[in-house]
């Protein structure tokens, strides 16, 4: 018998465990109070987390080790676990099943008396009943007592009482499927990456619990499994995977018997210059910290002070250290389990339980100091880093003092390169950061000088990910930027003095421009994160193309926009003749072309792994699958290759021959006396990209199995493949127009720059947001740090996804 089964047998979790405090209507009237923002997506995803948290609470109690979240094709979500199953008996007070009570009463559950659950994700009027109230419909399945139970709700109202639908079932657990209310949420489309991040977090925090995430919404079924036995130590290593740790992880696990508070802690110092501390209470992240974070910081400072005094190392230090110095380069995950946690708000972003502080501070101080004493070599390396941080802080202080003295003597504190705006109100003022004097000059001429300031940055911008704070302050470009913004950095940072509430990075659409943008984003993320949090940082989106037709001009953002323009400009004068009779025109033709565009994109993706032309001709003949290995497919295969050999624009023109083997097919391409071999493995046809393109080709199979003739403005073209159809329409669309591609902002004149990028009524801006801090931390460390291997792996993993590379 497993531990899970034993726990189930011991359980006293029944209908009597469910306590009720009533009402659901308030949830529908003010959903934001219970589930979070219903407009920005946070509340929508919190619906999933509320259900998942119930499963995790079962895991914390020792009754569950498997949780699955499935995003369904119809837009609903299913969350299932192998816990005890929600109680199904009739509730004595309510006269209905306990399951129905839990789903329809706001304050109902087994977490009030701390008998069924000693630890849970806290209690503030949220729960699965809120999910039910804010769903168009919800279905609940329970496996308990060797039976399967079912109940369905519409807008939180029970359709019919809980019923038994199957018996003699050897299974335990709960499954909730819900469809979010369209009337409540602005957008009901779930984001896979957001959910993935939270589930990974939960898997790290609950060692030994397997969490599956399945996305069935698209043809490509995506499945991710999270299972970690290393707990939060593995979490720290995951977060810091792109950095050099200077010692092995320090791990603390302790339980305070009197209060019932337990503490899990994993930390190490790395060679970076930034602290990264993640705090959790009962598996819920506190972005604003709280009593556990304050206790941790205090304990670490005490540990360093005590160790320096004990070892006599304090006599060798040049400068006194601060608490910030002790935490430079620290990476830590701090997780506490508290029986009755108290938070500052409904969102649980800050823990205010005062009883947590002494427990955490004493445990961290005792255990970490003990580790220092047992590992003197590693401890000295940590102390050396802290002393180096103190020295750098002192150097930075002197640099700031020097800057202040210079500024006091100057008539104007603003840098000479800055072309400032006339407005003094930050709320309407904009700062454009541009690369080089050339683009800066054009921008100065084209701007609205009332509200728009231009700051050209010339020369190499410092990578602050690899530089200490004092070196950063010595950088001309960074110094110019800080002065122009009107605010300082680090502890002196204050948004009150910020001179512009729109700070816009405007760089060229080439490799150099992308690099400069990445360097600036790194600076803002590391040293002015509040600028991002307040929504003040933006990225300009200058157009890539200008299309001129007669006297009219149009600017297009990217390659996709240009393609759409060329198709739309041609479609009204175009029709497709099928087998010399049927005509495809108007919306039907447009629908086909949209499918061909998607098919073309799939071909581009697959072409990184196998020849594009061969893939296309096989796919539209239903041969880009295992049917190609069947003997009866040989004639169709040869016919398909004959078509490919006869395509005038095909790069594989001349002669293409084929040789079948049991587990592979060889394609021989003869051209200009040279022979090139392309091999298609049988196992390759099972790859998702290959299966996807094979299945999608079926949607256009009927059309391309016919003899096709395209008529564009009375001119006829024979069509054999989807690519040929798309390319013909695009080429026809280019006739009579002029297309200009901009590689840099300097290629535009001031009027063009105003019209496309500066004019607030026409431009497109991307607002910079950080959805998940630890994921952003990993990306900046990987791409901008000095550890090569994670960056190499990142490039390898994502290289095939690059469609347009400007070299």
From Swiss-Prot:
Residues recorded as binding Mg(2+) 2, renumbered to this chain, are 508, 510
Coiled-coil annotated spans: none
Query: In terms of domain of life, where is this protein from?
Result: Bacteria
What's its EC?
Answer: 5.6.2.2
Where is it localised? Cytoplasm
Task: Enumerate the PROSITE patterns for this protein.
Answer: TOPOISOMERASE_II (PS00177), TOPRIM (PS50880)
Query: Which molecular function GO terms apply here?
Result: ATP binding; DNA binding; DNA topoisomerase type II (double strand cut, ATP-hydrolyzing) activity; metal ion binding
Q: Which GO terms describe its cellular component?
A: chromosome; cytoplasm
Which InterPro entries does this chain map to? DNA_gyrase_B_C (IPR002288), GyrB (IPR011557), HATPase_C_sf (IPR036890), Ribosomal_Su5_D2-typ_SF (IPR020568), Ribsml_uS5_D2-typ_fold_subgr (IPR014721), Topo_IIA (IPR001241), Topo_IIA-like_dom_sf (IPR013760), Topo_IIA_B (IPR000565)
Task: Report the SS bond pairs.
Answer: none
Q: Which SUPFAM superfamilies match?
A: ATPase domain of HSP90 chaperone/DNA topoisomerase II/histidine kinase, Ribosomal protein S5 domain 2-like, Type II DNA topoisomerase
Domain named Toprim is located at 429-543
Cofactors per UniProt?
Mg(2+); Mn(2+); Ca(2+)
Quote the Gene3D superfamilies the UniProt record gives: 3.30.230.10, 3.40.50.670, Histidine kinase-like ATPase, C-terminal domain (3.30.565.10)
Tell me what reaction this enzyme catalyses: ATP-dependent breakage, passage and rejoining of double-stranded DNA
Which parts of the sequence are marked as the site Interaction with DNA?
A: 460, 463
Its function, per the record, reads: A type II topoisomerase that negatively supercoils closed circular double-stranded (ds) DNA in an ATP-dependent manner to modulate DNA topology and maintain chromosomes in an underwound state. Negative supercoiling favors strand separation, and DNA replication, transcription, recombination and repair, all of which involve strand separation. Also able to catalyze the interconversion of other topological isomers of dsDNA rings, including catenanes and knotted rings. Type II topoisomerases break and join 2 DNA strands simultaneously in an ATP-dependent manner.
What other remark does the UniProt record contain for this protein?
Few gyrases are as efficient as E.coli at forming negative supercoils. Not all organisms have 2 type II topoisomerases; in organisms with a single type II topoisomerase this enzyme also has to decatenate newly replicated chromosomes.
Q: Which PANTHER family match?
A: DNA GYRASE SUBUNIT B, MITOCHONDRIAL, DNA GYRASE/TOPOISOMERASE SUBUNIT B
Protein family membership = Belongs to the type II topoisomerase GyrB family.
Q: How does it assemble?
A: Heterotetramer, composed of two GyrA and two GyrB chains. In the heterotetramer, GyrA contains the active site tyrosine that forms a transient covalent intermediate with DNA, while GyrB binds cofactors and catalyzes ATP hydrolysis.
Name the NCBIfam families for this protein: gyrB, PRK05644.1, PRK14939.1
Entry protein name:
DNA gyrase subunit B
Upper taxonomic lineage: Bacteria, Pseudomonadati, Pseudomonadota, Alphaproteobacteria, Rickettsiales
